[in-house]
Amino acid sequence: MSREPPPRHLSITVNIYYHGADGSARRFAEEMTASGTVDAIRAEPGNLRYEYFVPLAGGETVLLIDSWEDQQALDAHHASPMMSAIAALREKHDVRMTVERYVTDEAHDAAADRAFVRE
């Protein structure tokens, strides 16, 4: 009798690059934070990380790293009323997005990468 392997836990990370003009991407991220929207998203079940970054070289792009425990948690976030608040702020600040999506690679032996990490 063959047994099915246990389901793999595949966390999801979405990198969203917000692009705008005249500082609009940065103002968008600042208002997301000041309005409490960022804290509310971080409190959603399954959220692992929701954090904005600004490039050292400046420019008109802000990076959001948005990580979730699994697809169900991300789907619940997308179905939440939070999305209309986010969409309204995107519209208000006239930002555009480029999106990259990553799924955890549990099959890879991360120990092999440790030699390159300074802790």
Name each model feature, range by range.
Residues 4, 12-13, 29, 45-47:
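Short, flexible segments with low predicted structural confidence
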Residues 35-48, 67-103:
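An amphipathic, aromatic/His-enriched active-site/gating alpha helix that lines ligand/cofactor pockets
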Residues 25-27, 59, 73, 108:
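Intrinsically disordered, low-complexity acidic/polar segments
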Residues 1-10, 52-60, 85-119:
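Glycine-rich beta-strand-turn "strand-cap" elements at beta-sheet edges
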Residues 19-32:
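Short, surface-exposed ligand-recognition loops at beta-strand->loop->(often short) alpha-helix junctions
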Residues 11-19, 49-80:
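Short, well-ordered beta-strand segments in beta-rich or mixed alpha/beta enzyme
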Residues 13-17, 31, 101-103:
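Generic alpha-helical hydrophobic packing signal
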